Amino acid sequence: MSWYEQIEPNVLTYVKYSVEELGYSPRFTSVLDKTVVDDNGVPKKLPTVYIHMLQPAEVGNDLDNTEINGVLATIEIQIFSNNYNESQSLRTITLDCMKKLRFNVPMLPVTTNQGDYFLTIARYRRVVGGGDSDLITEL
């Protein structure tokens, strides 16, 4: 596994640990497949926190250009909950976690009422270098 492929699972592990430490127990996933969602795309268990790294872009090339030195990582977090207050609490906790990992917030979290559940979506972005131990080694 390349160093940049470790970013998503390590972010998920860090956020999951932080949320559970505060007494919440949502389902965490990095995949929204048929084992997690119903035919309408809604998670079968609420609340669910979906954490996914969008396709990263290479940054920080050197003159040799023989290896990937850094990537611009964008993490999307979607929170599905049937309780508005719970969704807002999870939003605040996940935002705090991402700021502690030094991510910027190019898209502030937005919560919408989807009828049977509330959906909060946020995106976080930062440059991660091959030597950034906080996101590459096990947290």
Q: Where do the model's predicted regions map?
A:
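A common structural junction motif
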Residues: L95-N104
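Mid-chain, well-packed structural core segment of small domains
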Residues: N69-T92
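Residue-level recognition of well-ordered beta-strand positions that form the cores
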Residues: H52, Q78-F80, R123-V127
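A generic structural signal for short beta-strands and their flanking turns/coil linkers
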Residues: K45-V49, V71-I75, T120
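Short, charged interaction patches at domain edges and termini
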Residues: M1-Y17, P56-G70, V105-L139
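Small/polar-rich, solvent-exposed N-terminal microdomains that initiate assembly or binding
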Residues: M1-L63
